[in-house]
Amino acid sequence: MKQTVYIASPESQQIHVWNLNHEGALTLTQVVDVPGQVQPMVVSPDKRYLYVGVRPEFRVLAYRIAPDDGALTFAAESALPGSPTHISTDHQGQFVFVGSYNAGNVSVTRLEDGLPVGVVDVVEGLDGCHSANISPDNRTLWVPALKQDRICLFTVSEDGHLVAQDPAEVTTVEGAGPRHMVFHPNEQYAYCVNELNSSVDVWELKDPHGNIECVQTLDMMPENFSDTRWAADIHITPDGRHLYACDRTASLITVFSVSEDGSVLSKEGFQPTETQPRGFNVDHSGKYLIAAGQKSHHISVYEIVGEQGLLHEKGRYAVGQGPMWVVVNAH
């Protein structure tokens, strides 16, 4: 398995393309100059395209991915109704979902043969919309509205329209600020990192009565932490055994172990990392974690070690200015 790591740096308007080898070392293979401040990125389900959101002219760009080395070639673009904060796709590669924090909306862009061809739906009134996350069964779009302490739930119709479910939302504790999400591989649980109180919620997707319930909330910060809480990103290993979340003020990554059924998180430790870690990701083997420092302009690679999933630094690399997003593609 070959793996390519993409790093988006909006301040220098670049995507750095790296080869990740089996020992966790990175080799720079390409630097792409992007026509705008590039922020969120996602790889298409068939691994043929990288979709990126740019501003100040709000667009989604599609780059064709070379199957041999992961190199990028521009392929298409489509306008967006707000500044892109987060970008994702459905599992069949029919639609791109874009959450916009500033615009307070989530939009759906239709794909034709992998290329974006236009917005088919926009839902407004999502104050502080920070991500759009499709459930493993491709049926429910989870959309955190950070400033409203709620996660809105939509069914995606065949033509890409978003239909509010019943119930239409779940709520967090006041002042939590739900931000980004991941799902357990067993498709029974979701995990949401809350920006404003630096906590992680565990959501049971369906209990025996068909309800969605928060079954655990864990503080992700050290006990003696007294500064402003400012959590950012969350990821889980492919085997579902380890979960990680980062805080930008403390510049640390919190390490969690996950119970076998996915219902319980246990805090295992903390890893100091790059300054102001806005984004990170886990590779497809589950052996390595790559974190980007928005203020350090570097990335660090960590090996995931042992039953606790603790992080051991393997290497550090300079990238563009203000790196914010990390994506790993296996090919």
Curated annotation (Swiss-Prot):
Organism of derivation: Escherichia coli (strain SMS-3-5 / SECEC)
List the protein's name: 6-phosphogluconolactonase
User: Pathway involvement?
Assistant: Carbohydrate degradation; pentose phosphate pathway; D-ribulose 5-phosphate from D-glucose 6-phosphate (oxidative stage): step 2/3
- Pfam family name, one: Lactonase
Its Gene Ontology biological processes?
glucose metabolic process; pentose-phosphate shunt, oxidative branch
The record's similarity note reads: Belongs to the cycloisomerase 2 family.
Q: What is its EC number?
A: 3.1.1.31
Query: Which keywords appear in this protein's UniProt record, sorted alphabetically?
Result: Acetylation, Carbohydrate metabolism, Glucose metabolism, Hydrolase
Q: Which reaction does it catalyse?
A: 6-phospho-D-glucono-1,5-lactone + H2O = 6-phospho-D-gluconate + H(+)
GO CC, any one term: cytosol
Q: Which InterPro entries match?
A: 6-phosphogluconolactonase_YbhE, Cycloisomerase_2, Lactonase_7-beta_prop, N2O_reductase_N, WD40/YVTN_repeat-like_dom_sf
Q: Which GO terms describe its molecular function?
A: 6-phosphogluconolactonase activity
Function in brief: Catalyzes the hydrolysis of 6-phosphogluconolactone to 6-phosphogluconate.
What is the enzyme's class at the highest EC level?
Answer: hydrolase
User: Which positions carry N6-acetyllysine?
Assistant: K287
